[in-house]
From Swiss-Prot:
Residues 154-187, 364-401, 523-562 are annotated as: Disordered. The lineage of its organism: Eukaryota, Metazoa, Chordata, Craniata, Vertebrata. It comes from Mus musculus (Mouse). The keyword Coiled coil applies. GO terms for cellular component: intermediate filament; nuclear inner membrane; nuclear matrix; nucleoplasm. Nuclear matrix protein involved in the immobilization of broken DNA ends and the suppression of chromosome translocation during DNA double-strand breaks (DSBs). Interacts with the nuclear lamina component LMNA, resulting in the formation of a nucleoskeleton that will relocalize to the DSB sites in a XRCC4-dependent manner and promote the immobilization of the broken ends, thereby preventing chromosome translocation. Acts as a scaffold that allows the DNA repair protein XRCC4 and LMNA to assemble into a complex at the DSB sites. Residues 85-117, 237-301, 458-504 form a coiled coil. PROSITE patterns: IF_ROD_2 (PS51842). One of its GO terms (biological process) is double-strand break repair via nonhomologous end joining. It is found in: Nucleus; Nucleus, Nucleoplasm; Nucleus inner membrane; Nucleus matrix. This is Non-homologous end joining factor IFFO1. Forms a heterotetramer with XRCC4. The interaction with XRCC4 is direct, involves LIG4-free XRCC4 and leads to relocalization of IFFO1 at the double-strand break (DSB) sites. Interacts with LMNA; the interaction forms an interior nucleoskeleton and the recruitment to DNA double-strand breaks.
Length: 562
């Protein structure tokens, strides 16, 4: 393999020239008119830039990795493709210059008959002067004019690397030309990669000294080893190779596209995984904060339950005590009112009995008449001058007895054992009226079980407990309002009863006065009409109660009521 035609040659061509053209662009005849130097456009047009993958910049690392992963076979096929294209370009160029080369070779043979032999001609290498557009960095591309050296010298001027030494004519040509031009020509043609070395094949066909140059018909040239190369058309092998290379290129592009898609998906997945990891860390931090808050809420709930239980217990105790006091007060006052009414009625009956059950006996002697006259005189004197001292003492004793009786009745009422189930105000200790903390036991157990099973329902339990407390507090408030309303109603009833009792007492005093007046009138009229009847008992009956006694009794009863 010729090291001058490596794969890097065409990569450098693509980077430096940046030209793209169809394969096998023919060279015009005007490039070689007048024996001028060759242009660099044919090889550039026949270069691999037309088949190189598009892209303004160098291949990305992903493409390089994909290219390395596809294996060495693709690289080998690519290298062969590039070398075949270069070879075909050179063959086309040689075909176009075939006739010119024949003339130049004929002239060279005629000029060098005497100094050279067939063996030397056989081994002589002739450089065609084809200058490739690819040049090493730092070496300028020289466009040598046609008048500098004749065509024979350009054809026969062999480089230093040729098997044979330089000819005389070539040396003369080089001496006739300028030093700078010769140096530029040698530096640009001898060492430029891509220059074509052709070997002229001269064989002795006869015993003579003159060798005979065997030249082909123009479509082929004869290799020194006798191998003929067909250059007029592309062989099926090369076409098949092109097809294989195109298929490999398509597969490579498909693999590249798939790899880029997978690479993009992989990058997206990595970014998504990173985001999920960050979210997981944030979720862990939030979970720790929520756990701390749950612990704090548990502690606050315990304290809250303790405070609420204490407050509710105190409230229940106060409600029960107030209800019992209300019941006791109402029952006591109603019973006192009933007792006082009974006492007043009994007193009225006793007064009437004492008034109408006086037993009169007829007087048998003058002493009885004198006593009766003395009594009448005393009565008339008492009506005119006021009561005397014995009658005042009797009235005081009667008032004291009445006061003692009232004190005894009040002491009995105070000592009376009131039962709790009295229904004076229809107060009953039922589930609707009596509310204790024991009613919350079921809710507390349910809340404890819910906390043990599911911690996430703690907030719900707190809300339910608060709503339950609010509901119970509202019920307590309604119960208290109802009790206060009933208490106010009872107070109004008691005041009304007190006013009625006071009216009854005033009516009773008026009736007592009238009854006393009637009794005295009846007594006086009876004494006048039936003087024969006298009283049976020896002791004088107690005088009837006067208005002062009635007033004292009313005042004592009013004070007891208050």
């Amino acid at each position: 393999m010729n090291p001058l035609f490596g794969p890097n040659l065409f990569l450098l061509q693509q980077e430096q020239q940046g030209l793209a053209g169809p394969l096998g662009d023919p060279l015009g005849g005007d490039h070689f008119a007048g024996g001028g130097d060759l242009a660099s456009a044919p090889l550039a047009s026949a270069g691999p830039s037309a088949y190189s993958p598009p892209g303004p910049g160098p291949a990305p690392p992903a493409a390089m990795a994909l290219r390395n992963d596809l294996g060495s076979n693709i690289n080998v096929l690519k290298t062969l493709n590039l070398r075949f294209r270069c070879f075909l370009a050179k063959v086309h160029e040689l075909e176009r210059r075939n006739r010119l080369l024949e003339k130049q070779l004929q002239q060279a043979l005629e000029e060098g008959k005497q100094g050279r032999r067939g063996l030397a001609r056989r081994d002589q290498a002739v450089q065609t002067g084809f200058i490739s557009p690819i040049r090493p960095l730092g070496l300028p591309l020289s466009s040598r004019p046609a008048a500098v050296c004749p065509p024979s010298a350009r054809v026969l001027g062999s480089p230093s690397r040729s098997p044979a030494g330089p000819l005389a004519s070539s040396a003369a040509c080089h001496t006739s030309s300028s030093t700078s031009t010769s140096t530029a020509f040698s530096s640009s043609t001898r060492f430029m990669p891509g220059t074509i070395w052709s070997f002229s094949h001269a064989r002795r066909l006869g015993p003579g000294l003159e060798p005979t140059l065997v030249q082909g018909p123009g479509l082929s040239w004869v290799h020194p080893d006798g191998v003929g190369v067909q250059i007029d058309t592309i062989t099926p092998e090369i076409r098949a190779l092109y097809n294989v290379l195109a298929k490999v290129k398509r597969e490579r592009d498909e693999y590249k596209r798939r790899w880029e898609e997978e690479y993009t998906v992989r990058i997206q997945l990595q970014e998504r995984v990173t985001e999920l990891q960050e979210e997981a860390q944030e979720a862990d931090a939030c979970q720790e904060e929520l756990a701390m808050k749950v612990e704090q809420l548990k502690a606050e709930l315990v304290v809250f339950k303790g405070l609420m239980s204490n407050n509710l217990t105190e409230l229940d105790t106060k409600i029960q005590e107030k209800a019992m006091k209300v019941d006791m007060d109402i029952c006591r006052r109603i019973d006192i009112t009933a007792k006082l009414c009974d006492l007043a009625q009994q007193r009225n009956c006793e007064d009437m009995i004492q008034m109408f059950q006086k037993k009169l006996v007829p007087s048998m002697g003058g002493r009885k008449r004198e006593r009766k006259a003395a009594v009448e005189e005393d009565t008339s004197l008492s009506e005119s001058d006021g009561p005397r001292q014995p009658e005042g003492a009797e009235e005081e004793s009667t008032a004291l007895s009445i006061n003692e009786e009232m004190q005894r009745m009040l002491s009995q009422l105070r000592e009376y054992d009131f039962e709790d189930d009295c229904d004076s105000l229809t107060w009953e200790e039922t589930e609707e009226t009596l509310l204790l903390w024991e009613d919350f036991s079921g809710y507390a157990m349910a809340a404890a079980e819910a906390q043990g099973e599911q911690e996430d329902s703690l907030e719900k339990v707190i809300k339910d407990t608060e709503s339950l407390f609010k509901t119970r507090e509202k019920e307590y408030q309604e119960t208290i309002d109802q009790i206060e309303l009933e208490l106010a109603t009872a107070k109004n009833d008691m005041n009304r009863h007190l006013h009625e009792y006071m009216e009854m007492c005033s009516m009773k005093r008026g009736l007592d006065v009238q009854m006393e007046t009637c009794r005295r009138l009846i007594t006086q009229s009876g004494d006048r009409k039936s003087p024969a009847f006298t009283a049976v008992p020896l002791s004088d009956p107690p005088p009837p109660p006067s208005e002062t006694e009635d007033s004292d009794r009313d005042v004592s009863s009013d004070s007891s009521m208050r």
